[in-house]
Structures are given as C-alpha cells and as structure tokens.
Amino acid sequence: MGTMTTLTIHRGTHEIGGSCVEIRTDKAKILIDLGMPLDYDKHTTEEQTQIRSDAAEWCKGVDALFLSHAHADHYGFLGLLPQDTPIYATEETFAMLALDGILGDDPTEHLKKHPLTSGQSCEVADIIVTAYTVDHSAYGSCAYLVECEGKRLSYSGDIRLHGVKGVLYKNLPKGVDYLLLEGTTVLRAKNNPTEREVENRFVKAFGEASDAMHLVWCSAKNIDRICALFRACKRCGKTLVIDPYTANVLAAVAGLNPKIPTTTTAEQMKVYFPPRLTTRLTERNKDQYIYSLNPKQNKVSYDDFAHSPEKYVMLVRPTVLTYLQRIKAARIRLIKSIWGGYWDEPNTERFRSWVEVHCEQVKDIHSSGHADTKSLQRIVEHIRPQMIIPIHTDSPSSFGKIFSESHIFYTSTTIGQLSCNSAHARARRDSTPTVRFDDIHSQPITELIHSFTSS
C-alpha cells in the first residue's frame, strides 16, 4: 500500500499573513511558515489565546519547519515549536531573526538551525524540500519545492518580480503539480516601480527641497530599500543617518554580502542614538550593539542636526518620536517608504500628530514587496503548474479572473472546510482543511491565463 500525503493550509487561504502550511506523509510532518496574523493585536485577549492555542496544536509532532522569510506574519509563532525542532531557512533569514534579540529574544534560539542555499535540498524522511531564493522586501526570502509520493508542490512564499533580484523567479522549477501562490495584491493592475526607480524618486524629492532635512520612514529589514536610499543620498551629497537597530541589521547582512553599506564601511552613513533605545539595550546588558558602532566617530548629535539639517536624511519610525521632538530644523519633510496601512494604525497617532505640526510635506515613495497581477501571470507562465492554490490573500476568488477556473483549487470561506472547485471536483467538500494530494484533480494546462483589464 502506498503512502498517504496530505496538504493542510492552517491559515492564509482567506487572509493576508499568518501563513502556515502542513504537509504530512505516513513517515513525516513538516510545516512551512508559522506566522502571526497581521491583526493579532486587534483581537481580544481571549481570541489571542485561542489563536496561539491553535498554532501550538499545529506544532505537535512536527519533524521540521521551513521558513520562507523574516517577516512576523510568517515567523511570529516560532516560539511555540518544541525545543530542538529542526528549522530550515536561508542564512540571511537566520541573520535577520538573530537581530530580533537586540530588543527581545531570537525566536529561533531554542531550535536547531539548518541554513539553506538556493537550490539546496534536504530530506525529512520521505519528503524532499528544496529552497529557491526569490525577491521580496525581506532580505533572504525563498520559495520551496516539496516532493513526495511522486508529486511536486511549489510554495511561492512572498514574492515580487520588480525588485533587485526579481529575475530569480526564473530559477523556480517548472511543471509542478501544485503551486501555492501568494495573492496579496491580486487584481491590482498598476505596475510597481523598481528599486532603481524608487531611488530616482528619492533623488528628485531631495532636490526639490535641498535645504530641508528629510525623514524617511522605512523598515529596517528592507535592505534593498535602504541601499536605494543610501545611493540616493550619495548622489545628492547627503548623509544617511540610521538608528542602532538598523545599523546592526546592515552589519549582520554585510557579513554575508560585503556590498551592503554599513556605518563602518560607508563614509556617508552615520548613527543617531535614541535615548529610549540605548537605555533599553543597556538595561538588557546588550551594550555591544551600541559600542560596536563606534559612537565617538559615527554619532550624529542634536547639535549636528541643528547646525546643518540640510546635510542629513534620517531613517525613522514612530517609536523614535521622543528623539524627533528634540530636533531643531527650519524645514522638515517626511517620506513614507512603507505600506500605506501602517500610517493609519492606532499606535502611530502621536507620530502622525507630530508630523502634521512639524513637517511641511509628506510624500509617498514606495514599492510593494508583493507581485502585481502581471507578475503573478508571469510566474504561472514560467512554472506551468497543473493546479494553483491561492494563499496569503484575502481575495482568493480573484484568481479566477486572471487564471483558468478549472485550474484553481479554492478553499471554502468556512473555517475548517476545504472545497475543490476544479472542473473535475467541484462537489467535493471535506470536513477538515486537509486534502489528499491525489484528491486535487488536474489536467494538462490549456489557456491557463486569462487576459486582464483593469476596471
């Protein structure tokens, strides 16, 4: 008798973020990602307890976890994994997660870490998993190919084609049976700007107010964006000033890629030291994250900002507001280089209020970390899967507007059910969110991709 392989999507079929996928055979059980929902903090304490309890249940009996990248909506519940569980990810992802230990705890500290390079395979009993580097706003992101029971399943993770390494999608294996494809921005017709175009927009913005001090709100883990910002600063004769957390993130990544600028290798990159952050590091006996940055040589002070504010571009986030309140500059402008939804979060209210009073202009210069509609089509054109399974999306039905319905496996909107809406199995409905590989029927693809016209 052959083995039975099941696929369970615990979360992500009708939700952006919080992804967790389980693949189980008679001999092994693996998880891909173990994310915290993006809206976790908005839930009641009772709801949060249930969410964590569910995730802990998924972790029982797991033989290994494969992590796609270092964003909390994919790794936020790693702490629930049993002690010494093997975890696989790229070296860059592990480096990013280790930096979580600056302000908190490394979520992989209790796990057995196994770094993977692109194209490298590993075996967990009868399951073979291969990592493939892809482009995303989190440095070191990867997709996975899972092979078992004669079937091949590709998990896209979070992916885009307009980034610095966008062309890497062409390395993804072709002709897989199933493609779990992210759809964060499905049906968004607009093309995303490249990081080079973002850089040029920074340059233009700095030139429009060359005598102003510029603040840029950007994620410390978006390495490609910080590099684009740094290049723009160099082109405009300005100095990029970053906080200790960002400086340590860059230093860690530069250990794997010497092309990444750091405060010790780049003359036009300096550090500011928010008292709240430095005090917290000192209290946690983590002064090394301060002194390794050579403050005597690399520090930019309040006096420096006051004397020549136009010389500086400062990387900020809402948590450094106390520091910003002490800066004296005649003209200040803010550039948001981050997902727009963060601006309206309740915890940014005080920051927004300060910006409204002290910044003469607020500009958006950003590019998504996710594939747009045309990019999703290009990915599918390259891979040519037998069946597409939407994930990391709040609009799975939208996949039917750009791909052939007969090749999309939908889950139902009811938690705990999984329905197959393929042309061969529309009537099927299981009582659990689990399905056998052989129950996802497929056929050779013809005219898989629909033409897409924006409304």
What are these regions (language model features)?
Residues G163-Y245, A329-S404:
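Cap/insert and terminal regions of metallo-dependent hydrolase folds
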Residues F403-N421, V435-F437, I449:
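Charged, glycine-enriched surface loops/patches
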Residues K112-S118, V271-P274, F409-T411:
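Short acidic-hydrophobic, aromatic-tinged amphipathic segments that line or gate anion-handling sites
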Residues P193-Y323, I327-K328:
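Hard-cation-handling environments
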Residues G2-F66, A72-D224, A228-R235, T239-V241, ...:
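His/Asp/Glu-rich metal-coordinating catalytic cores
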Residues K328-R331, L448-H450:
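ATP-dependent carboxylate-amine ligase
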Residues D158, D430, D439-H441, H450:
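Intrinsic-disorder-associated, low-complexity terminal segments enriched in Asp/Asn/His/Tyr and depleted
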